Amino acid sequence: MSRRCDLTGKKANNAFAVSHSHRRTKRLQQANLQSKRVWWPSGNRWVKLKLSTKAIKTLEVKGLEAMAKEAGINLNHY
């Protein structure tokens, strides 16, 4: 189970945690992923996807079909 958005492909970013004395240690900035059921009208069923919050906002504008086509995923596998 990867921490990656199903539609946008967003994943963790490598960054530094910087202390007051400016010592830097590596850390991960995880994407804000949410497990979400989305209605798929042409499939006439719910599809459970792991989406970033940015993808959820974009989904409301573009729609599931268009975003899945851009991402190159087959919704029948979800």
Curated annotation (Swiss-Prot):
GO molecular function per UniProt: structural constituent of ribosome
Keyword tags: Ribonucleoprotein, Ribosomal protein
Pfam family, one: Ribosomal_L28
Organism domain of life: Bacteria
Protein name per UniProt: Large ribosomal subunit protein bL28
GO CC term, one of those recorded: ribosome
GO biological process: translation
Ribosomal protein as UniProt keyword: yes
UniProt-listed InterPro entries: Ribosomal_bL28, Ribosomal_bL28/bL31-like_sf, Ribosomal_bL28_bact-type, Ribosomal_bL28_sf
Family from the record: Belongs to the bacterial ribosomal protein bL28 family.
SUPFAM superfamilies registered for this protein in UniProt: L28p-like
Organism of this sequence: Trichormus variabilis (strain ATCC 29413 / PCC 7937)
